[in-house]
Every structure is written in C-alpha cells, then in structure tokens.
C-alpha cells in the first residue's frame, strides 16, 4: 500500500503495514538526514510508538503521517 510521509518534504512510501514506526523513521533519516531519535511520527496529531507496526497503529492505504522534530527542553 502507499503511504505519505510529510517531513521537510512530502514523500510517498510503498509499505505492507508490517513495518514498525522505527523502520519508517530510519527511512525518513535516509531521505532527509534527520536522525531517527530526533523524529516524532504523528498520526492525526497523536505520536506513534517506535515498536508498533503500522497496522497496529491503524495506518491504512494513502494515510499521511507527519514527522516532527523532537522538542528540546523540559
């Protein structure tokens, strides 16, 4: 299925739904140079856990995931 990932640019990925959020972060890192530990992947504004698969998160075909930078501070 196709998935859209919006980071600094919009990317289209071909996925099966079995990929983990961490794998998506690795892919974004290779495309945009943002370290995975500095990324937060959001679905409808809610952050997704690295260990969860896309299917477990409810990601369907043609879904757009947002990638935000992790905020520093406390």
Swiss-Prot record:
Note, other: This protein is synthesized with ribosomal S30 as its C-terminal extension.
Family in the record: Belongs to the ubiquitin family.
Organism: Mus spicilegus
UniProt-recorded name of the protein: Ubiquitin-like protein FUBI
Gene that specifies this protein: Fau
Tree of life domain: Eukaryota
């Amino acid at each position: 299925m196709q998935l859209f990932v919006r980071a600094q640019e919009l990317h289209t990925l071909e996925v099966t739904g079995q990929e983990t959020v961490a794998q998506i972060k690795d892919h974004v890192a290779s495309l945009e140079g943002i370290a995975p530990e500095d990324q937060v992947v959001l679905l409808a504004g809610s952050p997704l856990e690295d260990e969860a698969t896309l299917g477990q998160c409810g990601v369907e075909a043609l879904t757009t995931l947002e990638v935000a930078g992790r905020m520093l501070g406390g």
